[in-house]
Amino acid sequence: MSVTTTWGYTLTGVNTLPDMITTQEFNNFTANKYANDGRVSSDIKAAQSAVRNYCGWHVSPSAACELSTTFFDKCVSVVDRMLMIQLPATFVSSITSITIDGVEYDETYVLMPNGILRVYGLSWSHMKMWTPIVVKYTAGIPDNAADGIKELIAHRVTHALESSAGVQSETAGGVSITYNAAWINGSRATALADDNKEVLTPYRLRGVF
């Protein structure tokens, strides 16, 4: 049971990509204002897909992952006898196993906070261009620590629902919200604003090394 993602790795132990926020959680964020709106579920999926695609990995929740690569892959680099692998995640909580050419590696490795895995003491005989490398690891923000991401998605969905209805501003309980004019008329849940992207900065993959 696994799901192959569009970001180059596999989630194991699940048969669908887990949602980042449930419909009930969205209703809690919005005080059930849209509880009977049939667009909520599809807009949530659209918004969370936009977040994940912008960040370059599944972001949340924490999940068992597997990356299959080779020494030829752009996410792999070799310096002297040290192997560096850029895991497609910025929050990796643990490494389960590292297998090189079918043999599990049990020597020294270091996991960096930015998702770079450094593997030391490799034999030069292992370092052939197409040698298979498989890393099993756990990555993602735990569901109970992802309120900031959930709130961002909830806001993105709310903007989509309100702008599609032609609402440009509203006031409730002394709080006034003005919707970005660029989102009015045909706004979608996938349109991440600049302030959304700022919030997502810590979760976005920065590229290789």
Regions found by a protein language model. Give the residues of each.
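Divalent metal-cofactor coordination and adjacent catalytic microenvironments
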Residues: 1-209
